[in-house]
Amino acid sequence: MLNIAQRIFGSTNTRLVKSLYKIVNQINAIEHEFQILSDESLKNKTIEFKEQLNNGKTLDDILVPAFAVVREASKRILNMRHFDVQLIGGIVLHKGMISEMKTGEGKTLVATLAAYLNALEGKGVHVVTVNDYLAKRDADWMGELYNSLGITVGCILSDTNDLDRKKAYNCDIVYSTNNNLGFDYLRDNMKFSRNEMVQRGFNYAIVDEVDLILIDEARTPLIISGQVDQDIKMYNKIDKLIYELSEEDYELEEKHRNIFLTECGITKIENLLIQHKLISSNTSLYDIDNMIIMHYITQALRAHKIFSLDKDYIIKDGNIIIIDEFTGRMMDGRRYSDGLHQAIEAKEKLNVNNENQTLASITFQNYFRMYKKLSGMTGTAETESEELLGIYNLQVVQIPTNTPVQRIDLNDDIYCTEEEKFDAIIKFISECHKKLQPVLVGTISIEKSEILSKLLTKNKLKHSVLNARYHEQEAYIIAQAGIPGTITIATNMAGRGTDIQLGGNLKMLAKTTLANILDKEIISIKYKQLVEKVNKDKEIAIQAGGLCVIGTERHESRRIDNQLRGRSGRQGDPGLSKFFLSLEDDLLRIFGSDKIKGMLKKLGMKKGEAIQHTWISRAIEKAQHKVELRNYDIRKSLLKFDNVINEQRKVVFDQRNRILDNDSYNISLIYRDINSDIVNNIIHDKYYNLDDETYKLISSEITRIYSITLDYNTISELESKNKLIEHINNITDEFFNKKIAEFTSKEKDLWDNLTKKVMIMSLDYLWREHLAALDSLKCGINLRSIAQKDPLNEFKSEAFSMLESMMSNFYELIIQRLAHLKSDNIFHSYSKELNNLQSSQDINSIKISRNEKCPCGSGKKYKHCHGENI
């Protein structure tokens, strides 16, 4: 019934696109009006649009002429005219939806339409890319277009300093990466004054490769961390014991990436621990005193049995560098949490660094939901449309291609073993190479790409390898990948950001070929020769069948496979794609059902022979869909827990901003509440009457907080609670009045400035400790389900109680720190104390060279950041 209805009325996507063509026709109808304008008149249109907005018009009201202006400016500046389908993509972005556009359809140019229109409000537009290279490329490239229209453009890279970051954020449009934006938000909420903050709000974001950022990286939070004291030698001691375990000692769940000791394993590891004097002979592994040992063992097992070198991480300059499982890129600066990184360092016999404590964190899910309007672009989002709509309220709109796709997608070939599969791949590549067809081979890991590279070398087939080891040459390798006879092996990273053009990427080739030539006349001659060569090579590649894309195994997500296929057949070019699989591939081995193996037996699978059948293809798709649903459920569950933390983050950051915005504080209101709480808590919680023991406890608490000694004889004569509170208030009033007078005599605003800093530092310290407590709570909360309790509700309840306790401690800590301030040599002693305290909050007493990068993540050297005053 649904298919019949779609044939009659068209799908929702078709109807929406059809309706948008009405707006496109309006833009086309007025195109000639802007063609006759001078460059200056075209630029002045920006001023006109801003005036119209100030006079009450909306962005939708000026969309048609604004898009026409951008199209005309693009023709003049970039020599590129927006196609009608690109205009549709721009409208979709402006409306806060996702434009799904095939590779090569010009997403970078499409973004200029929505970015320009929304920049007219003057509230800022963030164009988000996946790496610094693309951010800089797009800012430089599209910046010429924006500047010609009087729109300012900024670019923020990983090494951009705070001053330049602030300037960039104040531009109309800023290009940056998701990581830079997220970390800037966290760092801003660790700053000690508004003037130090760099961001100016969250108005509108256009996220390129939106599926990668909002889906694939949704489970990885951004974390600013500092090191904590711990027994790092224990990681090496435990690592040595892991080699003593056999397969019967642990149970591995590859689907969920979990590992557990069996009863046999527990007995063996306990004996080994006792033998090496790591636990007492009369204790058990699960005794309270030994629970931390269990933590070390679990992480060591995960490091050895679940995480693999050249797949999950590589070793570079003596450090473990995590590999992004979705892009294949190195994630410099990222570390596994909860001791896993240290366990891997011990496994690889590297120097084990201290574990980190979270100072601030946020997930991309919650970061991007702060924007008033959010939109995105990608070549593959339809398979994740349910999640994008459910979590981010983003509708996916499939934009038609400008010219029909001519790529041929061949059926998968399935072999018994990986060895047979690789033999078939080499044979297929060799056949393509003979007819000069360019080939791109996609692998899921560095390990597999290097196995294939060795086989190609053995067969004397010249090729290039693009993976995290050689990421510096990425742009150049991609530029060459469409040249006839070229063979390129790539991990997932190759599918992002850069087009593979048949014949080669002229702009990139010109940049590398002509870089060292100074004579303009020679450059002109060489460039013409290069253009002729690229055009000739393009024809050869087309005649050979276009780019051939080979997948060496299926990814867990259909979307990643579609991205690989999408490298071929750009803008109507011919192309070919084919996947080679084996029963030893992770997807089929872990997630494939016995049904698939049964099918293959029925089809008479023999060694060295490939099977092609629609049954198998459908079964594999079902396995992928099953994994996608599982991953979606995991992300949904994580989001529910993170939403609890996110709401608390908003409360704390809002409180922090209110402190920063306030210039004077009525401290007496705080300490009077605290005095009342001290007396009430001691009397109500522990004692019913005002007796000697009660007076001693109250006196002790007052001394602890204020360093004031109460006169025992005086307070013991007070017969009521109210009189006692009044007496303590009078004493603390007098104490603080003297202290304030003492400080203000040195400098008028000194007390208020110190109070503000103490309040900020106290809140930051307690928030850091609170995050650690929430992490611990979250780790064990699922065990509550054994007692028939909902873990999420339990987490919400306890997290709220913990926040209440934190805020109560916050006020007490403020008073305690202020009470202990000394005015003697305040500009020297306390200024140094304050700076040391601030530094310890941000980096948690890390011992670091002054010329190394600051651990806070600012990108600056330590001596120019948190080590400036040390």
Swiss-Prot record:
InterPro entries reported in the protein's UniProt record: Helicase_ATP-bd (IPR014001), Helicase_C-like (IPR001650), P-loop_NTPase (IPR027417), SEC_C_motif (IPR004027), SecA (IPR000185), SecA_CS (IPR020937), SecA_DEAD (IPR011115), SecA_motor_DEAD (IPR014018)
- Origin superkingdom: Bacteria
* Keyword match Manganese: no
E.C. number, please? 7.4.2.8
How does it sit in the bilayer? Answer: Peripheral membrane protein
Q: What class of enzyme is it?
A: translocase
GO terms (molecular function) for this protein are: ATP binding; metal ion binding; protein-exporting ATPase activity
Instruction: Please give the start and end residues of each transmembrane region.
Output: none
PROSITE patterns from the UniProt entry: SECA (PS01312), SECA_MOTOR_DEAD (PS51196)
The UniProt entry lists the main location of this chain as membrane
- Where is Zn(2+) annotated to bind? 854, 856, 865-866
The UniProt note on the cofactor reads as follows: May bind 1 zinc ion per subunit.
> Which cofactors are required for activity?
Zn(2+)
Key word Protein biosynthesis present in the record?
Answer: no
A GO CC annotation recorded here is: cytosol
Listed A to Z, the keywords are: ATP-binding, Cell inner membrane, Cell membrane, Cytoplasm, Membrane, Metal-binding, Nucleotide-binding, Protein transport, Translocase, Translocation, Transport, Zinc
Which reactions fall under this protein's catalytic activity?
ATP + H2O + cellular proteinSide 1 = ADP + phosphate + cellular proteinSide 2
Q: Which CDD domains match?
A: DEXDc_SecA, SF2_C_secA
Q: What does this protein do?
A: Part of the Sec protein translocase complex. Interacts with the SecYEG preprotein conducting channel. Has a central role in coupling the hydrolysis of ATP to the transfer of proteins into and across the cell membrane, serving both as a receptor for the preprotein-SecB complex and as an ATP-driven molecular motor driving the stepwise translocation of polypeptide chains across the membrane.
Instruction: List, alphabetically, the PANTHER family matched.
Output: CHLOROPLAST PROTEIN-TRANSPORTING ATPASE, SECA INNER MEMBRANE COMPONENT OF SEC PROTEIN SECRETION SYSTEM
Q: How does it assemble?
A: Monomer and homodimer. Part of the essential Sec protein translocation apparatus which comprises SecA, SecYEG and auxiliary proteins SecDF-YajC and YidC.
Q: Which family does it belong to?
A: Belongs to the SecA family.
Protein name (database record): Protein translocase subunit SecA
- According to its UniProt entry, this protein's organism is Ehrlichia ruminantium (strain Gardel)
Task: Name the encoding gene, please.
Answer: secA
